[in-house]
Amino acid sequence: MKIFKTVYRTVVAVFMLVVSSCLFMVPAIASTPSNVLVVGQIAEPKSLDPATVTAVNDFRILMNVYDGLVRYKDGALEVEPALAESWDISADGKTYTFKLRSGVKFHDGTSVTAEAVKFNFDRMLDDSHPFHDTGPFPLSFFFSAIEKVEAVNAGTVRFSLNAPYAPFLSNLAYPTGLIASPDAIKKHG
């Protein structure tokens, strides 16, 4: 009888050990809410401000949050329309006029206008702008050829360059050329 109790206890102990170890093998159930997207990144972004960001890790996020006037076609270095539906380049190559898509809104609900585009470039290029910020390693030099940005009307923005500058459109497609809401910048910096 003593042997039976010992065998019984051993069998029960092994069974409990097996059952308890199986609990650790159950896959973890994600606790992410259904309206949240989780994206793996190398590190936390330093900023979400296109004018200040210089890290490739941050660029990946910005390119999924903001749009620029133009962007690169998927898998190519060819520029295509984004916030701008079209553009004209003057014969001398010094003036770029962009027609903006109508009805486009920023995440905060404000409209994307020529004034918003002008605000973004003015704050990047004008040291005296009240919201001037280019971060510790400014990439604003991509736009150093810009002499003036004009909001011709709500849907048209014009860039005047100091000389013809072939990479201008390509530079607009770079993350530094992304357009953020002026209201959000004024509110959050």
Where are these regions (language model features)?
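N-terminal secretory signal peptides that target proteins for export/translocation
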Residues: 1-7
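Surface-exposed binding/hinge segments that line
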Residues: 118, 136-185
